[in-house]
Amino acid sequence: MALRFPRFSQGLAQDPTTRRIWFGIATAHDFESHDDITEERLYQNIFASHFGQLAIIFLWTSGNLFHVAWQGNFESWVQDPLHVRPIAHAIWDPHFGQPAVEAFTRGGALGPVNIAYSGVYQWWYTIGLRTNEDLYTGALFLLFLSAISLIAGWLHLQPKWKPSVSWFKNAESRLNHHLSGLFGVSSLAWTGHLVHVAIPGSRGEYVRWNNFLDVLPYPQGLGPLFTGQWNLYAQNPDSSSHLFGTSQGAGTAILTLLGGFHPQTQSLWLTDIAHHHLAIAFVFLVAGHMYRTNFGIGHSMKDLLEAHIPPGGRLGRGHKGLYDTINNSIHFQLGLALASLGVITSLVAQHMYSLPAYAFIAQDFTTQAALYTHHQYIAGFIMTGAFAHGAIFFIRDYNPEQNEDNVLARMLDHKEAIKSHLSWASLFLGFHTLGLYVHNDVMLAFGTPEKQILIEPIFAQWIQSAHGKTSYGFDVLLSSTNGPAFNAGRSIWLPGWLNAINENGNSLFLTIGPGDFLVHHAIALGLHTTTLILVKGALDARGSKLMPDKKDFGYSFPCDGPGRGGTCDISAWDAFYLAVFWMLNTIGWVTFYWHWKHITLWQGNVSQFNESSTYLMGWLRDYLWLNSSQLINGYNPFGTNSLSVWAWMFLFGHLVWATGFMFLISWRGYWQELIETLAWAHERTPLANLIRWRDKPVALSIVQARLVGLAHFSVGYIFTYAAFLIASTSGKFG
């Protein structure tokens, strides 16, 4: 018999039903479960797939550059970044008819185009790109890197080039390589690019390979470095009247500590950014020489962890046994990586709007909103994934003997206390926050708004004041104009920083009040509940009171029959599945809050947010309903306008989202009967009965249907909000 899909599981390949196809797709990347897998092949497959991932990333970014160079308006945007709308790419078939063609022909284009809300124009402009030729060069270079990555992936699967398991488990060498080689050297290289290309570019000098060695980024070159006069590199920075991209008002400094924002571009000073990357490079280059490899000097990770035994024995044996546990579990390593990456991604969202690094991006409001929302959603999915792989670690890789009485074992031992504390925090936050919102709703409804319970966030305001915000009148630490820290800040460190905090034109330390207090606690409720579900799922993955032998059933089992008091919904997979809904819910509140607060800030009517955000009806009426009107008018009796694509996506997103419920609120029996009926009709219909299928159609398993439902729910939810966000922001600000 010919080999059938999936080749990696002969048991599954012989399944006579359509389960073969769906289970095959579901387990295609679960290399550990494949036939004939060895530890060596497992590591090699994952290693090779990393190169494939890199190839896809380089190809995608190459495509961005290529399409903007081919169909965009980068060169005309560079001449006037605040008034020309950046074009992402052309639209081949605008829907529908001539009105759509006219509506989407904008940004100085000859035909219908999409506007770019990704910030790539601002990014490329800031780092020194100026012409379409620059963009084409970048696209070709990334295409070349993509090809190299594919070749490297293939090469490392060939017998002579396969790394051994010991190579993959050499933690110290990997740490040194990643810290020094990846973070250190790349940060140093980026500092070099900023100093040699981007900073001269911001001062009107066009540096490329042909004049790279002739243009000194600093008049005295490397002289001050070798004579120890490093402070010279910070002298004569760009003036506050500097026009970005020209020599007007430009200085000569390359590494500064100015603080605050460039007055024209509203972004961080490029010379501050270069200084930051140089400092990061130094720290990581040092860090990458700390671990013991060939020369017998430096730290051994195992020795470090074995020595981590807390005094007094209150945490048992501390980190004993952790080295081998982590080093032998790819799920543990992936969980750690995802947790770190998730936090970093959320930090990127927070910092991209509050400390914009790219020239003029702060004045492109739709891009600001899109990037914040994009990075928060990405962070949510990555963070939930960390707990999923943490749970798989406990089921597949955790060895109780190896971890006796260490911090891991102790987490499992007192999991009841962890869950009950999280549960208490979630209940407290939920009932109190909802109680305040609903009370305020009722007061508004009865015409007595003065009876609302409005709580000033005095502690948060005090923290903002301590960092230099003066408007609250606390007169404490950096907001106290006669304190030593304040006076030092005037001259020594970041003199522009305190000015930036107290300007009302940016997103630093926004003024907060009772509406912020309430939504902050609503978000805290979402975070604590999501965490509770995820932590419970991971800590109960091996067993719970109801099902002590849970680990024998694997990560994602549907049920274990009626005899266990109802064991549906208690696999670690179910916890992940439920947590994703809460994660989406929480990020909904986060993005609603961010967007509404910023819309009112940008429009100059912050009182709308302050007055309407203290009760639920205010959010529904003055944020959601009021801002969806432009969107819904994308198509109207008078024809099509440029928001029509978002109106269509808004409707389509709702459709996808609603489709999810067909899979989420349903029973397998219903689907099985429907399938049997359709198959019966098919087999008895002339012509149709000439086509036979090899596999007997069966309904999806409970877990599979939940996954399909969850995917539709998530995608529809994000599509709907993305359309709302972009249309409501671009409809107001262009």
UniProtKB/Swiss-Prot annotation:
It comes from Illicium oligandrum (Star anise). It is found in: Plastid, Chloroplast thylakoid membrane. The keyword Isomerase does not apply. This is Photosystem I P700 chlorophyll a apoprotein A2. It comes from the Eukaryota. Chlorophyll a B1 binds at residue 654. InterPro entries: PSI_PsaA/B, PSI_PsaA/B_CS, PSI_PsaA/B_sf, PSI_PsaB. Its main location: plastid.
